[in-house]
């Protein structure tokens, strides 16, 4: 099974209106008695975490880890930073002992079981501890079978290659499944119960969309890939600037892959070429 690094939102909200990641962090850490100074710094650091995997400068990532470690020492209840450190340690290859210490703090102070099960699952997957992974995974499916976060977990366990195989044999059914998950990502009640912020909901939506887009690109169906992206992530479905900033590297990667395919297939057809660039907002 492929190792998975996922950056998940882990914080609760009390009403049916979704909140931003920063609002969720402020609310949950305040309940733990963490100072406003530390909360503000946590929000600042957290905004850069989704882009760690795409950051080419290892020194920059290591400096970020040092800064997070310094803030975390001021209050170990800050489970947001414990989660962030695990993600950074995965990216730079820190040893398992340091990851486990942060996981223990994360599980101790994060009050939301659904997010703990999901994130711990990703930790065990990356570590290769499949016994612990299977235990958590079955518990997640049993206790939260209809939750968005469970649907996402199941999709990741299935994996890209298996999804591609289904699309080759029954594209309509595979797309219906991916579209149903993406629709849940737009449903504020569904994201609320899974403790997912607005920014992270769109990140998961992008990930589900990438399964289909990458399949189309692999099959040399560039126009289908571009149209799928436009219909789901641009136009009326384009999110706020705050959400785009949080997901800027993931979104830019997908756009870049589409732009390259568009150039290869349609550069000599200027009308189609430019129309497609406009669809993915690369003009």
Regions found by a protein language model. Name each.
Residues 196-201, 205-283:
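Long, ordered, amphipathic alpha-helical scaffolds
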Residues 65-114, 118:
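Post-signal peptide N-terminal segment of secreted/secretory-pathway proteins
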Residues 55, 89, 124, 158, ...:
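Residue at a conserved register position within TPR or TPR-like alpha-solenoid repeats
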Residues 1-20:
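Classical Sec-dependent N-terminal signal peptides that target proteins to the secretory pathway
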Residues 60-71, 96-108, 130-144, 169-192, ...:
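Alpha-helical repeat scaffolds
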Residues 80-84, 115-122, 149-159, 193-194, ...:
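Alpha-solenoid helical repeat scaffolds
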